[in-house]
Curated annotation (Swiss-Prot):
It comes from the Eukaryota. The keyword Mitochondrion applies. Its EC number is 2.3.3.5, 2.3.3.16. The active site is at H301, H347, D402. This is 2-methylcitrate synthase, mitochondrial. Optimum temperature is 45 degrees Celsius. GO terms for biological process: carbohydrate metabolic process; citrate metabolic process; tricarboxylic acid cycle. GO terms for cellular component: mitochondrial matrix. InterPro entries: Citrate_synth-like_lrg_a-sub, Citrate_synth-like_sm_a-sub, Citrate_synthase, Citrate_synthase_AS, Citrate_synthase_euk, Citrate_synthase_sf. CoA binds at R72, K190, L300, V342, G344, Y345, T394, K395, N400. Signal peptide: none annotated. It comes from Yarrowia lipolytica (strain CLIB 122 / E 150).
């Protein structure tokens, strides 16, 4: 049984109001679980008030094309952590990516935000102190060990099995450790669901670097295990160490940035929605995230970062890296005329350059300005929007997050493209699991939208087929 939540000493630290965001305070509890427990009654009352007073208010219309077009634009999900504006990009609890880079805690001597701080922000809506983030890092480190049967399961995977498939298998296998499932089977009160979901989520996030690095070392480094979890290090530094990059401070900084900006992107994308959907059936965080990771593995979602780099390397092999804009323009047109897409460009919601792309570009300008692949990516950025606009078949000719990440990883020696989506998966857990905890705390029901056949839709719109 999980022990009762105990009050902790309050902090008096405050942060000043910011433009375009509500006033926010540093969290007032030393422990994340304790602080979230404080917030639950207030947030539940807000939801009750909203539904009681405005529950019958129309919030949007649905046209037939949306039903056949992937449900894009339909307002039908609740996602607290982030909101995506087509013109501005993503905001995490009201904060832009530059806001996160400035205001979330950093590692000593570092410039990039720690993903632990983002997790705290997403769950509470508050910016944690340095001490609170350090405590969260240590908490995750203390939970990182994985069961023997999960180690053996990963080690038995054939080298032909994609890293994302291995990741999904391993996360599913952690179901044996689920506190939520065990508590549910014992008949725990539903008001306590969130506590067990919290514990599972914390354990899962903590174990992902160990799982992900074992997959990497098995597939690409002959199974030689390096590094170990150090309770004094942050999450990204430990992950980098397990991968074999623990001595590279720049790579660790990149990993901090990568894990932060890939974590959350509203709730309607495949991995986020799948995790939330499966969780709504009261499946544990392990089963729910595993389902989300299987969605992330798809080429139209997270696997796109692998395909972008493969395409860039293919371009380089054909036209070289010391190329002109005219060379790239011709190559882009040849790609489009062959019926292929230009990977890394376009987005289901965004209509401007993805701020996550911009953050990675700024990192590259600081750390690798003369790198030939960065030069190639930059030149593509100058040419592709014009070509795609002239081609006329995309609503968004601007680069997305996948357009840049692979090049950064290549620079530091993580060259195995098939592994890139695994890094995305580790990051995505940090973004989607806070919502799963909130769903259980706020009593979110199982999802069950209505579906119709084509014949029924035709009847609804008055058309005889």
């Amino acid at each position: 049984m999980i022990s009762a939540i105990r009050p902790a000493v309050r902090s008096s630290v405050r942060v000043a109001p910011m433009a375009n965001t509500a006033f926010r305070a540093y969290s007032t509890q030393d422990g994340l679980k304790e602080r979230f427990a404080e917030l639950i009654p207030e947030n539940v009352e807000k939801i009750k008030k909203l539904r009681k007073e405005k529950g019958n208010t129309v919030i949007g219309e649905v046209i037939l094309d949306q039903a056949y077009g992937g449900m894009r634009g339909i307002k039908g999900l609740v996602w607290e952590g982030s909101v995506l504006d087509p013109e501005e990009g993503i905001r995490f609890r009201g904060l832009t990516i530059p806001d996160l880079q400035k205001q979330l805690p950093h590692a000593p001597g570092g410039k990039e935000p720690l993903p632990e701080g983002l997790f705290w922000l997403l769950l509470t809506g508050e910016i944690p102190t340095d001490a609170q983030v350090k405590g969260l890092s240590a908490d995750w480190a203390s939970r990182a060990e994985i069961p023997k049967h999960v180690e053996e399961l990963i080690d038995r995977c054939p080298p032909t099995l994609h890293p994302m498939a291995q990741l999904g298998i391993a996360v599913n296998a952690l179901e044996s450790e689920s506190q939520f499932t065990k508590a549910y089977e014992k008949g725990v009160n539903k008001k306590e669901y969130w506590q067990y979901t919290y514990e599972d989520s914390m354990n899962l996030i903590a174990k992902l670097p160990v799982i992900a690095s074992r997959i990497y070392r098995n597939l690409f480094k002959d199974g030689k295990i390096v590094g170990s979890i150090d309770n004094s290090l942050d999450y990204s530094a430990n992950f980098a160490s397990l991968l074999g990059f623990g001595d590279n401070k720049e790579f660790i900084e990149l990993l901090r940035l990568y894990l932060t900006i890939h974590a959350d992107h509203e709730g309607g994308n495949v991995s986020a929605h799948t995790t939330k959907l499966v969780g709504s059936a009261l499946s544990s965080p392990f089963l729910s995230l595993s389902a989300g990771l299987n969605g992330l593995a798809g080429p139209l979602h997270g696997r796109a970062n692998q395909e972008v780099l493969e395409w860039i390397l293919e371009m380089k092999s054909k036209i070289g890296s010391d190329v002109t804009k005219e060379d790239i323009e011709k190559y882009l047109w040849d790609t489009l005329k062959a019926g292929r897409v230009v990977p890394g460009y376009g987005h289901a919601v965004l209509r401007k350059t993805d701020p996550r792309y911009t953050a990675q570009r700024e990192f590259a300008l600081e750390h690798m300005p003369d790198y030939d692949l960065f030069h190639l990516v930059s030149t593509i950025y100058e040419v592709a929007p014009k070509v795609l606009t002239e081609h006329g078949k995309t609503k968004n000719p601007w680069p997305n997050v996948d357009s840049h990440s692979g090049v950064l990883l290549q620079y530091y020696g993580l060259t195995e493209q098939s592994y890139y989506t695994v890094l995305f998966g580790v990051s995505r857990a940090i973004g989607v699991l806070p919502q799963l905890i909130m769903d259980r705390a706020y009593g979110a029901p199982i999802e069950r939208p209505k579906s119709f056949s084509t014949e029924k839709y035709a009847e609804l719109v008055g058309l005889k087929l």
